[in-house]
Each structure stands twice: as structure tokens, then as C-alpha cells.
């Protein structure tokens, strides 16, 4: 389903809901307006007749009617019906080139000033155009993280200025470069604060024992066209060391944005702020860990030495404050971060307008190409931002980009080339009158541009006849003021001509206070006095009408809210604000909430009803019908186009391929970038067993950017003998390797056992002993020769 029918469906839904209401009800007469100003507020089609004698003298509402009805009833020439209008006050033509040295004569947006006069409920429309001119001056401020982890990056950008200037001067002849650095707040727990670390926080760190003291932000080089000064300043820098992983870079970003004179931002130049880091940032409320409870004031705090003096006094800035100050000073922030933190900073870009994020290599060697890519991305996009929009104004945008197709609800164009013009239709509507403030203004500005459109707003909330007041007029019996064909009675008097006093007995005319015979006086919600109803007051709202039959609180509710908070209650029926329809105004006609990430309405698988997707494709589900397991995937749908292009030698304008490639912008390349975060990479095998590769990205305008290889990748057929030899050789090598491993293990085991034996042997200790079974061959006997026969003694020896 294409996008236009989805938008058309929403419009038809609104018309279908509105036609029965207009056909069956004249909202002007049912609104029970009691004055010209009230009549104008009911509906932009309502008009007031200021003729003295007109219509039913008892019915004020007969004066408030459609203009055609008033003319038909004889009120010609005295009708109050102001219309909304637009007047262009200043409209300088767009420039084609940023030719001057300062760029002060370059106009990239037209018109520059418009005055609109608005009647509540009625839209007025004006056109504006934006162009990215060629050769526009560029100011680039390089803001670098000098914490210890960025040491190798610092080494690699020593000559960055020269190389970067060479590349940028291919894009603009007027280029200037500046430099600043940051680490973190010099307080605990963000930095090392012990006395021994004050002069050298790297003490005790073996890998890099010497570094400079920690600091918040230092502005080192104002914007200059002397790139040698940049190189010289970079060569002077040394890294420092902080304590925790996050860095204090957002402090530095804010100072670089608001210290315009110190940095040297030119008024008429494209402002680029390159933020390089390898870690996450501290944000608002982190400062409370260090006792910093004062929120950041968003002001410049650089001293004479260009150092940030409030680093240890105020908290880190919030994302909202950063976005405000960057937009206020027309600065495009480029996050150059390492791959592991890419998604975090990618999410930041959705919260901070005008920011882009690129992946920085670990050693910053790709920084030049990164900056060139970011510059090209910024120059290829135009997005309108609204400043100081009054609360009672509704704005509606329709973008017409380079393809000439209108996209309702969109205020951004992408994929532009330098010199392309993006057109926007802006519709302005006042929901109500602002009260005392009769005139207001707001500004439309493309993100990152100095050009802007100032819109002065005046409200048509008063009638011309109100200027001719007649106090104590004879037309009002001397008891009131005559204005716009009516009498405004003084206190205590009633009647169309103020002819009655309150409290007079008019019982004979009480039937004039009944809406119909048998109905209660003044619908039971008022008193009949002087032949007319005086309605009671109610804590719920206003009771009004000739017979007090109407009120402002008896309309349909949604979740307990009258008219869903998107309309006004008039006599039992909701009058919806612009952008809402339905009996209780709960149905939004805005289709922006139905846009999928690829920019398509309901992922091209459903329709947008009341701001929500109703999936019509079988199997599709999700908030924007983005999930569909049974649907053909995007690669399959794009494959038909690619195959047709290959068959017809890459000619997308070929009649045969026109149907398959009607929404694709074709780019032929020799190699596909596989790490592109935004692109979807697709493969398929051709009939010749070759691999065809292509990638695509969905553009916001509903088209696809299709990047296709010029030739499929075809590998040569494998050699059977080579495969056989490789298999046999592999088996032999594996077998020999296993045998060698086995032999090695056995040898190691034997050596361990032998060493164990030797160790035990050396520790052994033996005791001397004789064998009890062993007898010596020689025996010795001693004889006593003084042997006495009787005394059995012998003394001697043998």
C-alpha cells in the first residue's frame, strides 16, 4: 500500500465524520452566541449581522448564522466575518552560491518575514523554501577527550589539521579550524583528589606513570584558517587521568556552544562541533555524587586563560539544555565515538536536534573520513524547527523534497544534493483567542542554519462594529449600551431593548420562556424574567441559549475528559480542534505516529486510523505493522528489481524494469560496505551459482536507496585432485600429529616416574643389622687353669 492512500484515508475519514454534522446541524445558530465576538469563535464559517432591526427580536442567535443565510435574510452590507490572511513582509531571493568571504550576503531561506492574521478555527497557509548553497563557509571546532585512554588517538592527530584542511577545502573555499580538550571535574569521585595525585594523577600507574593534572575543559585554539597553529597546539597536548569511566565532555560541549566570542564562531558560517571520545558522558544529576547540587545555568564560564571555572561548582548539563544551546547558536554536533558506545550516542541524536554520530576507530585514524561523512550527511538534510510557538496555535507542515512529491505531516527532507531546494507548506490555525495579548510571534528555522523566518501573528477576535459603542443609547431605552445591533443592558435591566427591570411580574408572558408547549420554563435551568430566560450558573460550566437548553458540559467524554481534551463542547456536541475528529474528538488525523522507522505509513502493511495503525496485510502486527513473519522480506521484494537490472544491463529506465524499480534510487558500486549501520545487506544466489550482493536504505520520502554490485561474485569450480590430496594430506598430518603427541606424553610420564624414583632413593636411610641365621666359622672358648675337681673350678684357657 503506498503512502498517499494512507494519508488520503485519514482525510476522507475526517470528511465522512464532518459531513453528517454539518448537514444535520447549523453550528452557528445552535451555538447560542450572545455577542459578535462569541459568534466568531463558534466556527470560521459563522458571520454576525450588525443591522439594528434584523430577524427575530427575541432571538439573538438569529444574528449569528452562515454568511449566505444572513444575506438571504436581508442583512447585506452589515455583516461581520473577518477572514484569516497572510502578508509577506520581507522576501529576499535564495542565493545559489556562498560566494563572499563572510557569507553575509548569502540567503538560504525565503521568505524572511511574514505577518498572518488568524480567525480562530480557520487556517491560513504560506510557502517557504530552503536551499543548501554551494561553497558556504565552515567553522569546525575539534573537541577532544584527553583522558588516558585516548593517548594513542592523540598521537595520530598530530598532523590532523593539514590533512583535514586539504579535504574540507575541496568542499568549501572558506574553512576555519579550532581546538579544545576536556577530561572531567577535578573532584571526587570523578578524579583522584589525594595530595599525591594533584600534580600527577598517573603516579603508580605502571603503563604511563606521568601525566598532567586533571581539568574540566580548556579552550586551546580559537577558530582560525592557519592549520599549522592547530597542528602546533595539538603537539603540545598531554593526556591526563580521571577516576571513573564516564567523561565530562558535555560540560565542554556546552561551553564551546555558548562562549561564541571566545571560540570565534562566525555568524554567517556552518558551525560544526566534533566531539571525540571513547567512553560514555556524565549528564545532569551525576554531579550530586560529588556534592554539586546547583543545576547548570547554561552560561559561559571561561576565564582569561580560557579554562572552565565552574567545573567544580555546578552539575553537568542536561540533554535538554544542550539541545537548546546548540540550536540557539546554530551548531551541528558530530559525535565521533568508538563502536561499543555507538548506540548510546545514536539515541542521543534523537533527543538533541542537529546531531549526527559516526564510529571512531580505536586509534582515531579514520577521523578525517568520519568528519567528511558527517559533513555530507548534514548538508544532505533540511529539517525545520519551531521556536516560541504560542500555546493556542496549531502548525501543520507539508514537505516537498527533491523528487517533487508532497509529504503531509513531514517537515524534513533528506537525500538532498548541494544546491537542491526543499519546499515546505506551513498551515497556521488559532484554536482560540489569546486573551489580553493581541499579537504574538514565532520563528521557523532550519536546524543548523542562521537563516530564519519570523512569523508575526495577529488575531481576528474582535468585530469592527464593536468600535462604535453608544453608552446609554436611546435604542436601549437609555438603560444600556448599543453595539453591533444589540443592547448590552446595565445591571438590573433586561429585554432586547433593556425595557424591563428585574423582578417585574411578567407571568402573562411566561410561555415565551418555554421551548415548546408542555416543556418546563427555561428548560428547568433558569428563571423567566421580562419574557426571556436568565440561565442559572453551574459549577460544571456555562448554561446558555434562549431557553437555557444548551450547556458546555454535556458532551461525550473519553476517559473522563470532556471531548477528549481536543475540542469544545457546544450545546451537547463536541466541536473538535484541528487535527481531531469523532463524536468525542478522540480520533487524531495526524499520521506521524503511524510512521515506521523506514518512514512508511504503517510499514506499507496497513492504514492509519485515529493515529494508530490497523494492519491489513495478513500476518502483520506491531505498533506500525513492522512485524510480519509471513510477509515477503525486504530483500525478496528488492531482488526482483536487481534481477531485472542485471538482465537489462543496469538500465532502471527500461520499460521492463520500470514497474519493479519504480520506488528505487539505483547506485552501482564495485564493492559493498558491509558495516553500514543504516543499510540492510542482502544476498541471493543466481542461476549460475554466483552470489549477488546489494544493500538498501529506506528514505523518509518513501523511496529506497538501492546500492548494487556491478557484477555478481562468482567463485571458480574446485579441483577434484586438489581436494583429494588435501584430504589425504590432512589425514596423514593429523595421524602423525597424534602419534607425536602420544610419544610426547609417554616421554613426559616416564621422566616424571624416573625423577620420582631418584628422589625417593636419595631420601632413603638404612640401619646396620646381622642375619640371625648366620654363624661365624670360628668359635672361641676360654678355660680356667685353676680348675679344682671338687670345687669345679678351672682357671686357664685353651
Curated annotation (Swiss-Prot):
Glycan attachment sites: 347, 460, 479, 505, 586, 654, 705
Binding site for Mg(2+): 147, 149, 247
Domain I-EGF intervals: 465-499, 500-549, 550-586, 587-626
Domain of life per record: Eukaryota
Compartments reported by the entry: Cell membrane
SUPFAM superfamilies: EGF/Laminin, Integrin beta tail domain, Integrin domains, Plexin repeat, vWA-like
GO cellular component: cell leading edge; focal adhesion; glutamatergic synapse; integrin alphav-beta5 complex; plasma membrane; receptor complex; synaptic membrane
Molecular-function GO terms, alphabetical: integrin binding; metal ion binding
Positions bound to Ca(2+) 2: 184, 242, 244, 246-247
InterPro entries found in the cross-reference section: EGF_extracell, I-EGF_1, Integrin_beta_N, Integrin_bsu, Integrin_bsu_cyt_dom, Integrin_bsu_tail, Integrin_bsu_tail_dom_sf, Integrin_bsu_VWA
Stretches assigned to the VWFA domain: 136-378
UniProt topological domain (Extracellular) ranges: 24-719
UniProt topology in membrane: Single-pass type I membrane protein
Binding site for Ca(2+) 1: 149, 152-153, 362
Alphabetical UniProt keywords: Calcium, Cell adhesion, Cell membrane, Disulfide bond, EGF-like domain, Glycoprotein, Integrin, Magnesium, Membrane, Metal-binding, Phosphoprotein, Receptor, Repeat, Signal, Transmembrane, Transmembrane helix
Phosphoserine modifications at: 770
Assembly and interaction partners: Heterodimer of an alpha and a beta subunit. Beta-5 (ITGB5) associates with alpha-V (ITGAV). Interacts with MYO10. Interacts with DAB2. Integrin ITGAV:ITGB5 interacts with FBLN5 (via N-terminus). ITGAV:ITGB5 interacts with CCN3. Interacts with tensin TNS3; TNS3 also interacts with PEAK1, thus acting as an adapter molecule to bridge the association of PEAK1 with ITGB5.
Function noted in UniProt: Integrin alpha-V/beta-5 (ITGAV:ITGB5) is a receptor for fibronectin. It recognizes the sequence R-G-D in its ligand.
PANTHER family from the UniProt entry: INTEGRIN BETA SUBUNIT, INTEGRIN BETA-5
Family (UniProt): Belongs to the integrin beta chain family.
Domain notes: The VWFA domain (or beta I domain) contains three cation-binding sites: the ligand-associated metal ion-binding site (LIMBS or SyMBS), the metal ion-dependent adhesion site (MIDAS), and the adjacent MIDAS site (ADMIDAS). This domain is also part of the ligand-binding site.
Protein name: Integrin beta-5
Species this protein is from: Mus musculus
Gene: Itgb5
Amino acid at each position: 500500500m503506498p503512502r498517499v492512500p494512507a494519508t488520503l484515508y485519514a482525510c476522507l475519514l475526517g470528511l465522512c465524520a464532518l459531513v453528517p454534522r454539518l448537514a444535520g446541524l447549523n453550528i452557528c445558530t445552535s451555538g447560542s452566541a450572545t455577542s459578535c465576538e462569541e459568534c466568531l469563535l463558534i466556527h470560521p464559517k459563522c458571520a454576525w449581522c450588525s443591522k439594528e432591526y434584523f430577524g427575530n427580536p427575541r432571538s439573538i442567535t438569529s444574528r449569528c448564522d452562515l454568511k449566505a443565510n444572513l444575506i438571504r435574510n436581508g442583512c447585506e452590507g452589515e455583516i461581520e466575518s473577518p477572514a484569516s490572511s497572510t502578508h509577506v513582509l520581507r522576501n529576499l531571493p535564495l542565493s545559489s552560491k556562498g560566494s563572499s568571504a563572510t557569507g553575509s550576503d548569502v540567503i538560504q531561506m525565503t521568505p524572511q518575514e511574514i505577518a498572518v492574521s488568524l480567525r480562530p478555527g480557520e487556517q491560513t497557509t504560506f510557502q517557504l523554501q530552503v536551499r543548501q548553497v554551494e561553497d558556504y563557509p565552515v567553522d569546525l571546532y575539534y573537541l577532544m577527550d584527553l583522558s588516558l585512554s585516548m593517548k594513542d588517538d592523540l598521537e595520530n592527530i598530530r598532523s590532523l589539521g593539514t590533512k583535514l584542511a586539504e579535504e574540507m577545502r575541496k568542499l568549501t573555499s572558506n574553512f576555519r579550524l579550532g581546538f579544545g580538550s576536556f577530561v572531567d571535574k577535578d573532584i571526587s569521585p570523578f578524579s583522584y583528589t589525594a595530595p599525591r595525585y594533584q600534580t600527577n594523577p598517573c603516579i603508580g600507574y605502571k603503563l604511563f606513570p606521568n601525566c598532567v593534572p586533571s581539568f574540566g575543559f580548556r579552550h586551546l585554539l580559537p577558530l582560525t584558517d592557519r592549520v599549522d597553529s592547530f597542528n602546533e597546539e595539538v603537539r603540545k597536548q598531554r593526556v591526563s587521568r580521571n577516576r571513573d569511566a564516564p567523561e565530562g565532555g558535555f560540560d565542554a560541549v556546552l561551553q564551546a556552544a555558548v562562549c561564541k566570542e571566545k571560540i570565534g564562531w562566525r555568524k554567517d558560517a556552518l558551525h560544526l562541533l566534533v566531539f571525540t571520545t571513547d567512553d560514555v558522558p556524565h549528564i545532569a544529576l551525576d554531579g550530586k555524587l560529588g556534592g554539586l547540587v546547583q543545576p547548570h545555568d547554561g552560561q559561559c564560564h571561561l576565564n582569561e586563560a580560557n579554562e572552565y571555572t565552574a567545573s567544580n561548582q555546578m552539575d553537568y548539563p542536561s540533554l535538554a539544555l544542550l539541545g537548546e544551546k546548540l540550536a540557539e547558536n546554530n551548531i551541528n554536533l558530530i559525535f565521533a565515538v568508538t563502536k561499543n558506545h555507538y548506540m548510546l550516542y545514536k539515541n542521543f541524536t534523537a533527543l538533541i536536534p542537529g546531531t549526527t554520530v559516526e564510529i571512531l576507530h580505536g586509534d582515531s585514524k579514520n577521523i578525517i573520513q568520519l568528519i567528511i561523512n558527517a559533513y555530507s550527511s548534514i548538508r544532505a538534510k533540511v529539517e525545520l524547527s519551531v521556536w516560541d510557538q504560542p500555546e493556542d496555535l496549531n502548525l501543520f507542515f507539508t514537505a516537498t523534497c527533491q523528487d517533487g512529491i508532497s509529504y503531509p505531516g513531514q517537515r524534513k527532507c533528506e537525500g538532498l544534493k548541494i544546491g537542491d531546494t526543499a519546499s515546505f507548506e506551513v498551515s497556521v490555525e488559532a484554536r482560540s483567542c489569546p486573551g489580553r495579548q493581541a499579537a504574538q510571534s514565532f520563528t521557523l528555522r532550519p536546524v543548523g542554519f542562521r537563516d530564519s523566518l519570523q512569523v508575526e501573528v495577529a488575531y481576528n477576535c474582535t468585530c469592527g462594529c464593536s468600535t462604535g459603542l453608544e453608552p446609554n443609547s436611546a435604542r436601549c431605552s437609555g438603560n444600556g449600551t448599543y453595539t453591533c445591533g444589540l443592547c448590552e443592558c446595565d445591571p438590573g435591566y433586561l429585554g432586547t431593548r433593556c425595557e424591563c427591570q428585574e423582578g417585574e411580574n411578567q407571568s402573562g408572558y411566561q410561555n415565551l420562556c418555554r421551548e415548546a408547549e408542555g416543556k418546563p420554563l427555561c428548560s428547568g435551568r433558569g428563571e423567566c424574567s421580562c419574557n426571556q430566560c436568565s440561565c442559572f450558573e453551574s459549577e460544571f460550566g456555562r448554561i446558555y441559549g434562549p431557553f437555557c437548553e444548551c450547556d458546555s458540559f454535556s458532551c461525550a467524554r473519553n476517559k473522563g475528559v470532556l471531548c477528549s481534551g481536543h475540542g469544545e463542547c457546544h450545546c451537547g456536541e463536541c466541536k473538535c480542534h484541528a487535527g481531531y475528529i469523532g463524536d468525542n474528538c478522540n480520533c487524531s488525523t495526524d499520521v506521524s505516529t503511524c510512521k515506521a522507522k523506514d518512514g512508511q505509513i504503517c510499514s506499507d502493511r496497513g492504514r492509519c486510523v485515529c493515529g494508530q495503525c490497523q494492519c491489513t496485510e495478513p500476518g502483520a502486527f506491531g505498533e506500525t505493522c513492522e512485524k510480519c513473519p509471513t510477509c515477503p522480506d525486504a530483500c525478496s521484494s528488492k531482488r526482483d528489481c536487481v534481477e531485472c537490472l542485471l538482465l537489462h544491463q543496469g538500465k532502471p529506465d527500461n520499460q521492463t524494469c520500470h514497474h519493479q524499480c519504480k520506488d528505487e534510487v539505483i547506485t552501482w558500486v564495485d564493492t559493498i560496505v558491509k558495516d553500514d549501520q543504516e543499510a540492510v545487506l542482502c544476498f541471493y544466489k543466481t542461476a549460475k551459482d554466483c552470489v549477488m550482493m546489494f544493500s538498501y536504505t529506506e528514505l523518509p520520502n518513501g523511496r529506497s536507496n538501492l546500492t548494487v554490485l556491478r557484477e555478481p561474485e562468482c567463485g571458480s569450480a574446485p579441483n577434484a585432485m586438489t581436494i583429494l590430496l588435501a584430504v589425504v594430506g590432512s589425514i596423514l598430518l593429523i595421524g602423525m600429529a597424534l602419534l607425536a603427541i602420544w610419544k610426547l606424553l609417554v616421554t613426559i610420564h616416564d621422566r616424571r616416574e624416573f625423577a620420582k624414583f631418584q628422589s625417593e632413593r636419595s631420601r632413603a636411610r638404612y640401619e646396620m643389622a646381622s642375619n640371625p641365621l648366620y654363624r661365624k666359622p670360628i668359635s672361641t672358648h676360654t678355660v680356667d687353669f685353676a680348675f679344682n675337681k671338687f670345687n669345679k673350678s678351672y682357671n686357664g684357657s685353651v
